[in-house]
Amino acid sequence: MRFAIVVTGPAYGTQQASSAFQFAQALIAEGHELSSVFFYREGVYNANQLTSPASDEFDLVRGWQQLNAQHGVALNICVAAALRRGVVDETEAGRLGLASSNLQPGFTLSGLGALAEASLTCDRVVQF
């Protein structure tokens, strides 16, 4: 089956993103296709490359990045939600006159169209 995941919780502070990541790993391990992960609302914090967990904690931001690199899973970040929460790529940082960007490599700023497309092309969409 082909899946898409929607993550609405931050990398740390709630269980949503961690559960979504574990679900994503289980899907791939069972031979399913994970087409994309769409990060919305506070979920956009999963793409902040400035996140620095304690040395004894799992680095969820880099975990998502590794999922993208190893399995080609698209990591789409809602651009409107990201800008409101201070998560920007180089293009948006330049456009807004910000000194730097903080979008973790492997993540892409995108609109709700990416979520709509995933909903149309996947067998299941699971929200965390």
UniProtKB/Swiss-Prot annotation:
Q: Which residues form the active site?
A: 78
* Top class in the EC scheme: transferase
Ordered alphabetically, the record's keywords are: Cytoplasm, Transferase, tRNA processing
Q: So what EC number does this one have?
A: 2.8.1.-
Q: What are its GO cellular component terms?
A: sulfurtransferase complex
Q: Which InterPro entries match?
A: DsrEFH-like (IPR027396), Sulphur_relay_DsrE/F-like (IPR003787), Sulphur_relay_TusD/DsrE (IPR017463)
Q: Which domain of life is it from?
A: Bacteria
Please give the chief subcellular localization of this protein: cytoplasm
Q: Which GO terms label this protein's molecular function in UniProt?
A: sulfur carrier activity; sulfurtransferase activity
Listed under GO biological process in this entry are: tRNA wobble position uridine thiolation
Q: List the disulfide bonds.
A: none
Q: Which family does it belong to?
A: Belongs to the DsrE/TusD family.
This chain's function reads: Part of a sulfur-relay system required for 2-thiolation of 5-methylaminomethyl-2-thiouridine (mnm(5)s(2)U) at tRNA wobble positions. Accepts sulfur from TusA and transfers it in turn to TusE.
Quaternary structure, per UniProt, is:
Heterohexamer, formed by a dimer of trimers. The hexameric TusBCD complex contains 2 copies each of TusB, TusC and TusD. The TusBCD complex interacts with TusE.
- List the protein's name: Sulfurtransferase TusD
Q: Kindly list the organism's lineage.
A: Bacteria, Pseudomonadati, Pseudomonadota, Gammaproteobacteria, Enterobacterales
